[in-house]
Amino acid sequence: MISGLLKKIFGSRNDRLIKQYSQNVKRINALEPAMQALSDEQLRAKTDEFRQRHANGESLDDLLPEAFAVVREAGQRALGMRHFDVQMIGGMVLHDGKIAEMRTGEGKTLVGTLPAYLNAISGKGVHVITVNDYLATRDSDWMGRLHRFLGLTVGVNLSQMDHEAKQAAYAADITYGTNNEFGFDYLRDNMVYTAGERVQRSLNFAIVDEVDSILIDEARTPLIISGQAEDHTDLYLRMKDVVPNLTRAMEEKDEGDYWVDEKGHQVHLSETGYEHAEQLLAEYGLLKEGTSLYDAANITLMHHLNAALRGMTLFHKDQHYVVQNGEVVIVDEFTGRLMAGRRWSDGLHQAVEAKEGVQIQAENQTLASITFQNYFRMYNKLAGMTGTADTEAYEFHQIYGLETVVIPTHRPMVRKDMNDLVYKTADEKHAAIIADIKDCAKRGQPVLVGTTSIEASELLSGLLDKESLPHQVLNAKQHAREAEIVVQAGRPGMVTIATNMAGRGTDIVLGGNIEKQLAAIRDDESLPVEEREQKAAAMKAEWQEVHNAVLASGGLHIIGSERHESRRIDNQLRGRAGRQGDAGSSRFYLSLDDPLLRIFAGERLRAIMDKLKMPEGEAIEHPLVTRSLESAQRKVEARNFDIRKQLLEYDDVSNDQRKVIYQQRNELLETDDISETITAMRQSVIAETFRTYVPAESVEEQWDMEGLERALASDLQIIAPVAQWFKDEPTLSDEEILERITKNADEAYQAKIDLVGDGTFHQFERNVMLQSLDSHWREHLAALDHLRQGIHLRGYAQKNPKQEYKREAFELFEGLLDLVRREVTRVVFTVQIRTPEDVEETAPHAEVQNVQYQHAGYDEALGEGEGAEAAGQQPADAGPKIGRNDPCPCGSGKKYKHCHGKLS
């Protein structure tokens, strides 16, 4: 009550903002006569003048009044369209990084030209984002005329464009494109192997058209790039034959080709083992004569040999996995349950498949993924336009930090929004809709019928056919054709049935749109100029008559065939009528069979109808019914908001990690010499290995010098006679020993550089680092995905799933960084680089096939929800408890206590 009183005295925040912006509009209007007096060349020269002034320290805010006045005049000259005062306010709202809610028909597309021009002056690029390729192309051509008139460059970013065309589009001052394409380009740019392959510049300023659709409706579905890893089936099969020919040593000191470290779950080849393996691989035609497993070109062979050895010696059938229906299925080592659908990484699963003689499946990996929330929050400044944002203002503020400002209409709104009519059955509702359409058609009033599904639109179309009523059906599939039809939906007596989103972004002009016909007359050079003007004038006069007739019939009539889950979508449908002060009306027809009513209010309304003994075909019409429906919609909207917020909270964890990995990649691509990074990695890995065998602040009796020497040689290929040093000089401190090992490693590293020269070796290091980062990041994405799918079950253990996810994801990430450090150090020391050609062999290349771009379903991408209502439920996979003497569920035939029971 008090807040309402204060609002009356001081006005709402929205009113105060509009008042402030209106002061600026007065300044812009005062500049209009001066702009009108300029020639085209002088007007165009203003762009360079603004750039110079901005470079000299003037802010974009200082330039705003003059720049907006220039755009208004250019709009008049290039497009024949003058920006209204309310459109100027909309432009300022967008420039301030807010959301402008403007009614349908108020010229949002034209409003976007104002902040786009002003922000393009900085030279950092502006992205104008729309919902489909058709609108991106249309707006870049249409509004591009204004920008090009003022000397700016305009690009359009479409799917299926080649690399050069994309780079050119992003290099332009203003780039139009779709949300999906901008997001995928960002992901692709973080998968390239040279800086020159990237297409995007820094993310400076984005203007999102239909911002509610992009930032809210599509925010539940992440963008995913996935693909099949390179097919090495043949290699796995041949490696399977190589491994049995190698002999196993029981202990590390014993003779043999390899020994198995069961504690560390690794297999290590001895020096004789490497030689024997090289000989066998040469016999099988896998290794070229005169080459070594240590050569740069043979890193893949080394990887496959290691996978085959591990698969053969460390993973046993009916203990670690079972073979079922021709597939290798992992057995959970703690529960003994089968883990269908899970696969080991690093080629291990394929090695086991080769061992068991089943079909080897190519790994389908997620290569990169991001949500729209996290992509758009990376822009330095974000703004949006829509006809309906006020209902979601809270979400825009919570998730994106964006304020919503409702822009006043240019002319007062006179559309008549009638109360909903609720019928008992769907058949009664459909009969009432047909009767309403018939009545409108008789009076020559155009009708737009909005449906929530293609099925519903086809049903109504069939009923209209039975009544022999001419009509057109639009389902959101062919955007370009739809736009043409929607434009003409305002002709007298025209009946159009459309799904809610069909033809969005295109205005319905009462009397039809004659712009195309007028353009054809103006461009017809076979006619004299005078005759062209006469023809155009006659066409306009004819259109005015039709326009007036439609207004007299009541303007466009909107019929909603059912309420949508979101009030915003209903408001969008209503907003198709009553544009720019035109007459119009809207009415929703509902039945108790509609999903929303059935779930939230059906029983109560049905009871009322039964009590009133309402005859068939009669409807309930009352503001109370409309209000209760809006309350039901609010509940659904709140639930959907919670789902999106939850997705974001989970994705924020991987987003922080994504930023770290992508930043490292970018530094690698932009730095010529990464030897400092490699040195820091090497020293960190050596120190960690050293402290494993020589703990800090420990006595000499606890030091394992022989173990340290072996670990340095086998894990890092660093040869340091540590045991001998200590024997010769017993007084050596642990710090001195570490210093010597580091010095030895530094000398060995420098010797490798001296062999081929700085440039060649540093390029090799970069290649190794990129490959390692990319492959481990892909595996990490899969691990996070698996973690997220099962994390909700932690709720049953009275743990917070979100906190658990954050903690475990952090541990996984630390493990990833450690793996990369160790792998890069080992490969740099192991691989022998003799010529620049060897470096070419190590160059990373896209090891994936059948790359797919998905805007995947939320449930598919997220797995199950967090399971907040955990108390009264059972875990999805909870089976009966296994007794110690029961057969083990892995299928081995042993008792549980002698099989997987040992592990738990």
From Swiss-Prot:
Cofactor notes: May bind 1 zinc ion per subunit.
Keyword field contains Transport: yes
Superkingdom of the source species: Bacteria
InterPro entries recorded: Helicase_ATP-bd, Helicase_C-like, P-loop_NTPase, SEC_C_motif, SecA, SecA_CS, SecA_DEAD, SecA_motor_DEAD
Binding site for ATP: Q87, G105, E106, G107, K108, T109, D507
GO MF entries: ATP binding; metal ion binding; protein-exporting ATPase activity
Cofactor(s), by name: Zn(2+)
Membrane topology per record: Peripheral membrane protein
Gene Ontology CC terms: cell envelope Sec protein transport complex; cytosol; plasma membrane
Keywords tagged on the record: ATP-binding, Cell inner membrane, Cell membrane, Cytoplasm, Membrane, Metal-binding, Nucleotide-binding, Protein transport, Translocase, Translocation, Transport, Zinc
Documented EC number(s): 7.4.2.8
Keyword Translocase: yes
Function, as annotated: Part of the Sec protein translocase complex. Interacts with the SecYEG preprotein conducting channel. Has a central role in coupling the hydrolysis of ATP to the transfer of proteins into and across the cell membrane, serving both as a receptor for the preprotein-SecB complex and as an ATP-driven molecular motor driving the stepwise translocation of polypeptide chains across the membrane.
Self-association and partners: Monomer and homodimer. Part of the essential Sec protein translocation apparatus which comprises SecA, SecYEG and auxiliary proteins SecDF-YajC and YidC.
Name of protein: Protein translocase subunit SecA
Gene: secA
